Design a protein with these regions (language model features):
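Charged, low-complexity intrinsically disordered terminal segments
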Residues: 2-180, 184-520
Length: 520
């Protein structure tokens, strides 16, 4: 045997040993959840601004929850920032991503200012996307009123050791917390699809996401708080202070840096855009006009989803029957859409029952994860043949859409995760229609039954599916895929994936050959 082949054999055996060790000892190698249990603070009648603002509204609508759809990125930023400014008791923040960029720093500053007022701030972040942010997180965690915990964290925080830990614990670290919630005083909550970062709040200069949240006020907020507490106190969660050293001096330096940054032209320009947005004024003046909904709740996966033997507790078991129960129309929005054999069968079965079934997802050009598009493309012809309508979001808009907030940057990508059935039952949250959301990541969202709220979500679907935003996908008489652009006169028909370059199309096709669908 040649020396090269010998080295390769030893390397393969070493890698196999690492993987076997990970399978056998992953739980022992993982940092153990050891933070003291803590729970949502008790509600009070009029102790905080949110208590006082909501009291007359909730008295007028007993046992109902107020719900406002946030489909505008600037309004979504304002809802978080302004609600934090009114906090007087607690801020519970749970996110998959929190970027160290303009909007991430501005919202971190709001959390710090709340803590300075005596508000208890709990931040729960997924550790995969917190990589590289230890210095900032440890600085914030040094504040006596702020505690940061990480979901399924790495023991090794950087470098080669972190890479090796990824290999050893590959199965365990593949499970991530995809939840998104911003909960204020136990009275109001923003739940939906947005992470914290410029691209989610119409602040990015290149590509911004079309996304959707729900601002909740009233009883359903208790559901969100219970979800947060279950995760916060689970053994999958570790305080950042146990993974690094806190530095109070670094906190003051970081706050000074962020505060100085708010005076820069970039920040001032963005904040002026936020203030000029019509919907933001409703938050400023507290002239809110929510839907008042009796049948509404926040639902989620269990925090230890990878250990859950009873899959009836998985969120998909709650959501799938709602879609399967459609009688006239099912409209689904998912940026990462990989229905698999079962999902394709469910949607085409509905279509055979004369249910109008439609899906809005990203086109190849608009998708920020081409591998996911390759997973979707496997099922495109079968979906169309089964009567499912497909609409793919374009990377650039037409007409008014081209100059809207969504397309005001150089490009756009869909990030909304929602569906509405029969115009009244629906879901808005973090759950993508793909295998990763079904079985690997934890997810959460708002499930409701209300005609007004359903009509608003249906209108959002219809707008995204319309010619200003999307291509209509179909097969011609010979069964070949075509993309129709109804935004031109006459309509333009594309014979290949529109707006996607040759290399991107080739890459997406090659990715179809890889056995990675379960990871998408």
């Amino acid at each position: 045997m040649s020396r090269t082949r010998t080295y390769l054999l030893y390397a393969a055996l070493a890698l196999l040993a690492l993987l076997l060790a990970g399978a056998l000892f992953a739980d022992r190698l993982a940092p153990r959840g050891s933070g003291p249990h803590a729970y949502t603070l008790p509600l009070q009648a009029d102790a905080t601004e949110w208590d006082r603002v909501l009291a007359p509204m909730l008295a007028e609508h007993p046992r109902q929850t107020g719900a406002i759809l946030l489909n505008d990125g600037l309004e979504a930023f304002a809802a978080r920032a302004l609600s934090a400014r009114g906090a007087g008791r607690s801020l519970d923040l749970q996110y998959y991503m929190w970027h160290d960029d303009l909007t991430g720093r501005l919202l971190a500053l709001e959390a710090w200012r709340a803590a300075q007022r005596g508000v208890r701030v709990r931040m729960l972040l997924d550790d995969m996307n917190a990589h590289g942010l230890d210095q900032q997180m440890l600085a914030l965690d040094a504040h006596p009123n702020i505690e940061i915990r990480l979901y399924n964290p790495f023991r090794n925080r950087s470098g080669v050791r972190r890479v090796l830990e990824t290999l050893v614990r590959a199965l365990r670290v593949n499970h991530r917390m995809h939840n998104k919630a911003w909960i204020v005083d136990g009275r109001a909550a923003v739940v939906g699809g947005r992470n914290i970062g410029e691209e989610y709040f119409d602040a990015a200069s290149d590509t911004n996401f079309r996304d959707l949240d729900v601002l909740l006020m009233g009883p359903a907020v208790a559901d969100a708080s219970q979800v947060f507490d279950r995760y916060w106190n689970s053994e999958a969660v570790v305080p950042i202070g146990e993974l690094g050293k806190q530095d109070a001096a670094q906190l003051q330096a970081m706050v000074r840096h962020i505060e100085a940054g708010t005076g820069r032209a970039e920040a001032q320009t963005y904040l002026r855009r936020v203030e000029a947005t019509p919907g933001v004024q409703a938050f400023v003046t507290q002239q809110l006009h929510p839907f008042w909904v009796s049948d509404i709740r926040v639902v989620s996966d269990p925090p230890l989803k990878w250990r859950e033997d009873d899959r009836q507790h998985w969120l998909v078991r709650t959501l799938a029957p709602v879609v399967e129960g459609a009688r006239s129309r099912a409209a689904l929005i998912s940026p990462y859409f990989v229905p698999g054999t079962d999902g394709t069968g469910m949607l085409t079965a509905l279509a055979r029952q004369q249910v109008q079934v439609g899906v809005v997802t990203n086109s190849l050009a608009a998708n920020d994860v081409p591998a996911v598009h390759s997973g979707y493309a496997r099922y495109r012809e079968a979906l169309l043949a089964g009567g499912v309508q497909l609409h793919e979001l374009r990377a650039q808009g037409h007409g008014q859409a081209a100059t809207s907030g969504l397309f005001g940057s150089s490009g756009a990508s869909l990030h909304t995760k929602a569906f509405v059935v029969d115009g009244r039952r629906g879901f808005i949250g973090s759950f993508n229609l793909d295998p990763r959301s079904v079985a690997l990541n934890t997810e959460m969202g708002v499930l409701f039954d209300h005609p007004g709220m359903g009509a608003a979500l249906q209108a959002e679907y219809d707008r995204l599916a319309g010619p200003a935003f999307s291509y209509a996908v179909y097969t011609d008489g010979e069964g070949r895929l075509r993309w129709r652009d109804d935004g031109t006169t006459p309509p333009t028909v594309h014979e290949v994936e529109p707006d996607a370059g040759l290399w991107r199309r080739i890459s997406a096709r090659m990715l179809r050959w890889l056995p990675i669908e379960s990871q998408l």
